[in-house]
């Protein structure tokens, strides 16, 4: 089975982003650090189901608009944004 590099990258970046209470409201204690899938989806303007499919490798061809939304939601710098786009093209 091929590795899901795009999904692995998304999951790692999601874990690295601190939730912002001004944007997300409900910040109950978390079992794991970072954003929840639903929160990334909300911030990126995607459905939670679609984001989950991307992260799990069940959808591998996101549009440029989706990638830009994810880059903003995950607070990616220029280098990480370029890496995200490269992974999406390779998937």
Enumerate the language-model features and the residues they cover.
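Sequence-pattern detector for short linear motifs
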Residues: 16-17, 40, 56, 84
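Short helix-loop boundary/capping segments at the starts of domains
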Residues: 15-19, 45-49, 60, 76, ...
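Residues in the helix-turn-helix
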Residues: 39, 50, 80-83
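A short, Lys/Arg-rich alpha-helix, primarily the initiator
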Residues: 1-35
């Amino acid at each position: 089975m091929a590795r899901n590099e795009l999904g692995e990258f998304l999951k790692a970046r999601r874990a690295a982003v601190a939730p912002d209470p001004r944007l997300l409201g409900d910040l109950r204690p978390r079992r794991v650090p970072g954003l929840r899938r639903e929160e990334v989806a909300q911030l990126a303007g995607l459905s939670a189901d679609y984001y989950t499919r991307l992260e799990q490798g069940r959808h591998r061809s996101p549009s440029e608009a989706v990638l830009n939304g994810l880059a903003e939601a995950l607070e990616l710098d220029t280098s990480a944004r370029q890496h995200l786009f490269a992974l999406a093209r390779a998937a």
